[in-house]
């Protein structure tokens, strides 16, 4: 089981999404639990590596336009939650 670490920007993203009431935050928690346990995500979540400045990060879809960007640090056994939000919010 991985240890979860959250970056400051992720915390702000979650707070903003929670406050808006537009997203079912239990979906995010479910994805995080699966990743924490080291389980593979279903193809519906389209997990994939990112490129360029994000090349050491992964992205998955919680909903069609709701993403989670994360990193797995195998040396420290950590799941690092980096960002969450829409394509337009994350990749400006």
Q: Positions of the model-derived regions?
A:
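Basic, Lys/Arg-enriched alpha-helical interface segments
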Residues: 1-64, 73-79, 88-92
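A short hydrophobic beta-strand segment most commonly corresponding to one strand
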Residues: 81-83
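Short, charged interaction patches at domain edges and termini
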Residues: 70
């Amino acid at each position: 089981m991985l240890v979860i670490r959250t970056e400051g920007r992720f915390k702000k993203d979650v707070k903003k999404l929670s406050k808006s009431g537009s997203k079912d935050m239990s979906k995010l928690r479910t994805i995080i639990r699966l990743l924490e346990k080291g389980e593979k995500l279903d193809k519906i979540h389209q997990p994939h590596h990112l490129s360029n400045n994000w090349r050491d990060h992964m992205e998955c879809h919680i909903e069609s336009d709701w993403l989670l960007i994360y990193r797995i640090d195998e040396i420290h056994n950590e799941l690092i939650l980096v960002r969450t939000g829409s394509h337009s919010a994350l990749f400006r």
